Amino acid sequence: MSLNDFLAKSYGSKHGKEKTKKSKDKSSHRKSDESKRVTSRNIDIIDKANLITEENKKAASSNKTGKSLWKNLETEKLELVQHVDVDKKDDSKERMSSGAFAGLQTAEEMEKQIAEKEKLSMQKSGLLKKNQNTVYRDEKGKVIDGYEEELKLREKANLTAKVRKEEELKIRNIGEVQISKLDRKTEKSALLSTEDPLNQGNTLRGTNTSLLGRRLYEKNFPENRFGIVPGYRWDGVDRSNGFETKWFAKSHDIADQKIKEQTTNREF
């Protein structure tokens, strides 16, 4: 007998067999547990699916409740939900676009049929109300709060800016002709107020006064060198020695002579 055979008989073979048996037993136990769990889960799913189909078949056959069975994913419970057939039509008679049946009918019957259609459409709109609120998001996908208010404020600001621009353009486009017309209007209104006979009795309005606050003569008067206006009590008689008139005549003659000399001395 060799040494290897002796060691295998006395030590190696028994322990190896026991270890392999234990590992095999453990793996078989695990597989059986997992298979039991999977099968139990499958049975639960199949049972729930069978329940839903059976209940739906019952509701469809009876057609009294008009409800169908659905599973709520949040609570994980089966619930009955009212089923609304908005597009349901009567096969026996044809309906018009208003909802009334085609053919000879009374006014009351037509009103009833139209009211039924409106009621069904209202029910449909009531079901869709939950999904009517729009959600605004930015480029990264985050929800923007108060986006509609910001849009309204921007539109308001744009309108005010537009009005300002239009006013500025109007002011810029006003030329000298338009400005002169406006000035003439103001002058005409002032003349009308002075020439109005009702204003003649009003001594305080439209009176010429000096720097000291004294009333001045409002009609025509002869010129003088210093531009002094006579008082309002002057009777219009010139009582001077005629020096002012001679002075103005001489000054005009000197100015005329200067103009003549300038024109004759020019070389063409």
UniProtKB/Swiss-Prot annotation:
Transmembrane annotation, as ranges: none
Covalent S-S links between cysteines: none
Subcellular location(s) of the protein: Cytoplasm; Nucleus
Keywords for the protein's UniProt record, in alphabetical order: Coiled coil, Cytoplasm, mRNA processing, mRNA splicing, Nucleus, Spliceosome
Xref: PANTHER family: BUD13 HOMOLOG (PTHR31809:SF0)
Biased composition (Basic residues): 12-29
Entry protein name: Pre-mRNA-splicing factor CWC26
Self-association and partners: Associated with the spliceosome.
Protein's job: Involved in pre-mRNA splicing.
Keyword Protease: no
GO biological process terms held by the UniProt record: mRNA splicing, via spliceosome
Cellular-component GO terms for this entry: cytoplasm; RES complex; U2-type spliceosomal complex
Spans annotated as Disordered: 1-41
Gene assigned in the entry: CWC26
Family: Belongs to the CWC26 family.
